[in-house]
Amino acid sequence: MSEINISAAAVKELREKTGAGMMDCKKALIETSGNFEEAIDFLRKKGLAAAAKKAGRIASEGLTAAKVDGLTGVVIEVNSETDFVARNEQFQDLVKDIANLAVIAKTIDTLKTFKMQSGKSVEEEIIENIATIGENLTLRRMDILEISEGAIGSYVHNEVVPNLGKISVLVGLASNAKDKAKLEALAKQIAVHVAGNNPQSIDDSSLDQALVERERKVFFEKSKEEGKPDNIIAKMVEGRIRKFFSEVVLLQQNFLFEPKLTVAEVIKNAEKELGAEIKIAKFIRYELGEGIEHEEKNFADEVAAITQG
């Protein structure tokens, strides 16, 4: 193969086409006997092989995205290894394109198979971006919100560009209220509230009962240590559970924009104003990286990783 004459012009053209280094382009052309298309595939395979190594690294940065299309909304999270990549326009465009498809896809498994504008599947496009961006990227999760009538409010906190940021929230209000603008404004306000207050459920009945019992046990043991009589302990525990509900149950939280009222009271007032029943059908709140274990490294390991490339 070394006898094949590879022109500088061919190497330059391949470099411009692929963005690969000069020596890599020359090697690709030699390995493929000067076949330009095969040389591109050769470099792509090299890039994908490099991407496979990067895929083992922990990705806990990145972006969340919220997308609403009529009565359907979706939230996704795409992770990268560093916040620097989250500010990369190529990565932002990738997340936006995936969010647009997610509204139609409905499930994450289906979404991964959907074709993007490039003709590649979402999964393939992510792998290609791992190779070109140089970091592990993962489509971590998605959730969909659908209502038959009403309004969906969206809010993205710490936006880097519209609809992409660190926290993404959707709130679906089921209602046949005629004034859609006011209903949408209320849904938007509740979405902002959810971003800031991080409720765990819509109402107390839908709250994880194991969590409630765990809190009840903690309150009971704490009250017992204080040496209170059993009948007093029971009242104290119930009081503390009510306070717990007011902190984690959306309808019982004090509303961000009117702290003297609960979210339930704000909705009740809106029902009177709009002349229709309003129900929170569902909310979704994604905070970037929540639940991901961050890799612990000591200083020596970090220096070694940098020096070894």
UniProtKB/Swiss-Prot annotation:
GO terms for molecular function: translation elongation factor activity. The keyword Iron does not apply. It is found in: Cytoplasm. GO terms for cellular component: cytoplasm. The keyword Calcium does not apply. Keywords: Cytoplasm, Elongation factor, Protein biosynthesis. InterPro entries: EF-Ts_dimer_sf (IPR036402), Transl_elong_EFTs/EF1B (IPR001816), Transl_elong_EFTs/EF1B_dimer (IPR014039), Transl_elong_Ts_CS (IPR018101), UBA-like_sf (IPR009060). Residues 82-85 are annotated as: Involved in Mg(2+) ion dislocation from EF-Tu. Belongs to the EF-Ts family. Associates with the EF-Tu.GDP complex and induces the exchange of GDP to GTP. It remains bound to the aminoacyl-tRNA.EF-Tu.GTP complex up to the GTP hydrolysis stage on the ribosome. This is Elongation factor Ts. It comes from Rickettsia sibirica (strain ATCC VR-151 / 246). The gene is tsf.
